[in-house]
Amino acid sequence: MSCDDGRPLAGRTAYMDQRDLLLPWLSGRDNVTLGARLRGETPDRKRADELLARVGLGDRRDDRPATLSGGMRQRLALARTLMEDRPIVLMDEPFSSLDVLTRLLLQDLAAELLAERTVLLVTHDPMEALRLGHRIFVMSGSPALLGAPLEPAGAPPRDAAQVSRSDAYRDLLARLGVGGSP
């Protein structure tokens, strides 16, 4: 596969699964720097520590995944994905196991650090799609088909309170078959 610039996708993508896929025998920092080590590169430990701090795990960098809660593990997986610093990022339900406040904070962080990149975000949360998406597609049917894109106004991350009262939110809910009022 190649992009519209003709260059191959290999080495240009990062992926975050809805499961954290952390290696249980590695510390938090070692999980975050895993990609560099697998490529034979020297890990940027300073950047890893900065990302761990930004996701609220700066004091847990030496801990193994088994000692972390589900939400902490998800934050660690997000830090690992952001550490890859790739132009194309695939994210499958990256915020699903987080409490509401942490979810909003990490959505803001992801929007900041992934600006100007191509991100394919899979989510079942209409609010999340509207906060973070430039173009939102709803898949439905069997076999699944993509509907026409919804393009919300403004730049991500959009304010959650404003999104919940927006016409775009009502439109997205209608496309999902959930009535018209948030």
Residue ranges with predicted function:
Residues 26-33:
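Short coil-to-helix segment of the ABC ATPase nucleotide-binding domain corresponding to the Q-loop/switch region
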Residues 43-60:
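Conserved ABC ATPase "signature" region
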Residues 64-68, 72:
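Conserved ABC ATPase signature
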Residues 78:
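Hydrophobic anchor residue at the start of the ABC signature
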Residues 83-87:
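A short, proline-enriched helix->beta-strand linker immediately N-terminal to the Walker B motif
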Residues 89-93:
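Catalytic Walker B motif of ABC-type/P-loop ATPase nucleotide-binding domains
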Residues 103-115:
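Helical segment within the ABC ATPase nucleotide-binding domain
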Residues 139-171:
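Conserved beta-strand-loop-alpha-helix hinge in the C-terminal portion
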